[in-house]
Amino acid sequence: MKIGIVCYPTYGGSGVIATELGKALAKKRHQVHFITYQEPVRLDSFNENIFYHEVSALDYPLFQYQPYESALASKIVDVAKFEKLDILHVHYAIPHASSALMAQSILKEKGFRLPFVTTLHGTDITLVGKDPSYKPVVEYSINRSNGVTSVSENLREETLKNFNITREIEVIPNFIDFSRFKKTD
């Protein structure tokens, strides 16, 4: 498969999980395309099946804040069309789910189908996502995702308690690469 992954490229939990998942998928011969504003810090080795696509937002004096959400949606459209992505996996709902939804709508008008899965990681729901300035967009984007996962049962319950979610949320717990971590005496 050709898989797009949108994530924060930092050492935070969602970025680490997304990058490690992408690396594992690439080892299984899937083509993985990371779409983000800088190369993920955990992309620390070469793999011929991993690609990085940088998102850059126009720095224009009119904008007090760069419109990253729009730039991300445009980059998703470009990568999906050029690379013929089969699916997109976005990690952390803000702003990735709404950017994916916008990109999906644009692509649909061009005759291209791109399903996307949103993985909820924590503060995108429990802290930032609940803020009234983001909540309606987060709720709408989650409900319009083709699939939704949560990294824990507790986060799933928090999401259902604080948002009007009509989609099923599948719990897929965080994982550990046991080849990297071994018990010591």
Q: Which role fits each region the language model picked out?
A:
Residues 1-41, 46-54:
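N-terminal subdomain of nucleotide-sugar transferases
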Residues 8, 120-123, 173-174:
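Histidine-centered beta-alpha loop that forms part of the nucleotide-sugar donor binding/catalytic region
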Residues 106, 114-131, 147:
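A short, histidine- and acid-enriched strand-loop-helix "catalytic/donor-clamping" loop
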Residues 38, 154, 175:
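Carbohydrate-associated surface elements
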Residues 87-112:
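An aromatic- and histidine-rich active-site surface loop
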Residues 131-148:
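Membrane-proximal helix-turn-helix segments that form the acceptor-binding/catalytic region
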Residues 128-129, 160, 175-185:
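Acidic anion/phosphate-binding donor-loop and adjacent secondary structure
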Residues 48-77:
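A short, charged, and often flexible helix/loop element on the N-terminal side
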